[in-house]
Each structure stands twice: as C-alpha cells, then as structure tokens.
C-alpha cells in the first residue's frame, strides 16, 4: 500500500497536534523548496534521510516500444534522490526502528552503520589469517621432506652405480683386446709353420735327380 499527499497531511496533522491547514502548508512548502533548489542545480541534503539533486543525462539513442523505431533523445536533466545511510539501515533491518520519536536521528544511525561495516570485514580477515597460518606450516614441511631425501640417499646410490659400471666396462674392454691380440699373434705364427713345411718340399726333387743319375 502507498501513501498519497492527503494521507501524509493527515498523519502530519496528528503528529504536530495542529489543524489540517497548517499541516498542508508545511508539506507544500517543503516540496516547493526542494523542487526550486533542484531546478537551480543545487542539492538538498537531509541528514540521515537522503539527498535531492539534479543529474545530467547525455544525448542517446532510444527505441520506441510500440513501433520499434530508433529515436534520438536530447541531453536532459533529471531529478534524483540518494537515500542516506540511516534510511538504508532502517529499511534493510540493520538498524531498529524506534517506536516513538523520529525514525532518523542525526549522528545515530550513521555511527551504527559504520560499526556494522567495520566489524564484518574484521571477522573475515581474522578467519582468513587463521586459515593461512594453519596452511603455511604444512607447505613448509612438504617442501623440506623431499629435499632431505634427495640430498642424502638418491644421489649417493646413483653415484656409486655410476662409478662401478665404468670399471666393469673397462675390464671387459681390456679382456676383449687381450683376446684379440692373442688371436692376431696366433694368426701371424701360422704362416711361418706353413712356410717351414713348404721348404722341404723343394728339396725332394733334388733326391729324385740323384737317384736317376745312379741308375744310368
């Protein structure tokens, strides 16, 4: 449900304890003062309630909702209202609405809204700090453990294996070269024996020649 101007005047009449004429004049004078100030480009600030001001809109292109045609809109000035901190706090429920007296007091709602805004981030910051503190040692331990194992055990074993394997290879290579050398020596000696065996064969024809001479 909404409240119109007549209903507002009735409520104001009861609160002021005056007649309807005075309440009507009060409402009209307040509205007239705000409209004239905003028209000039000034802003009307009511602490805790809000600010009435003028906003400038640049030229833009709009669309007609009925026809769908594009329409150029000239730059204009538009009245605007910015609600105050106490007004926002009361509507959102952050600040309790008093049963009696003014709903918005100067310097009361604003301080309460600031306290709520300061307390909420502080709690979040402390929780985040605690989580970071618990996670940090775990990460440090995880980084230190692999470093010790890698530094003590792994490189030593690999180094020993690396030193032993070349020694075995060298001894095997020496044995292979020794076997090859002996084979080569045997190969060089074999032709000498064959040559010695061939030499007596040349002498055999000489004996046959002497035998033939005796027969003659």
Swiss-Prot record:
The modification N-acetylmethionine is found at residue 3. Residues 102-216 are annotated as: Disordered. Residues 115-216 have a biased composition (Basic residues). GO terms for molecular function: damaged DNA binding; DNA binding; DNA-binding transcription activator activity; double-stranded DNA binding; ferric iron binding; ferroxidase activity; structural constituent of chromatin; supercoiled DNA binding. Keywords: Acetylation, Activator, Cell wall, Cell wall biogenesis/degradation, Cytoplasm, DNA condensation, DNA-binding, Ion transport, Iron, Iron transport, Methylation, Oxidoreductase, Repeat, Secreted, Transcription, Transcription regulation, Transport, Virulence. Gene3D superfamilies: IHF-like DNA-binding proteins (4.10.520.10). GO terms for cellular component: cytosol; extracellular region; nucleoid; peptidoglycan-based cell wall; plasma membrane; protein-DNA complex. It is found in: Cytoplasm, Nucleoid; Secreted, Cell wall. Residues 103-216 are annotated as: Degenerate repeats region. Belongs to the bacterial histone-like protein family. Long actinobacterial subfamily. The highly basic C-terminus confers greater specificity in DNA binding to all tested dsDNA. Residues 1-102 stimulate Top1 and physically interact with it. A nucleoid-associated protein (NAP) that probably plays a role in chromosome compactation. Binds DNA non-specifically, with greater affinity for supercoiled than linear DNA, binds well to nicked DNA, gapped and cruciform DNA. Has a preference for A:T rich DNA. Required for activation of the mtbB operon. Binds the mtbB promoter in the presence of iron, binding is seen with as little as 25 uM Fe(2+) and increases with increasing Fe(2+). RNase E and HupB jointly contribute to cellular adaptation to changing growth conditions and survival during antibiotic treatment and in the host. Binds Fe(3+) but not Fe(2+). Has ferroxidase activity, converts Fe(2+) into Fe(3+) and in the presence of H(2)O(2) prevents the generation of hydroxyl radicals (the Fenton reaction). Protects DNA from damage in the presence of FeSO(4) and H(2)O(2). May function in iron storage. Involved in iron uptake by bacteria (either Fe(3+) or extracellular carboxymycobactin); antibodies against HupB block uptake of both. Following uptake iron is mostly found in the iron siderophores carboxymycobactin (CMb, extracellular) or mycobactin (Mb, lipophilic). This is DNA-binding protein HupB.
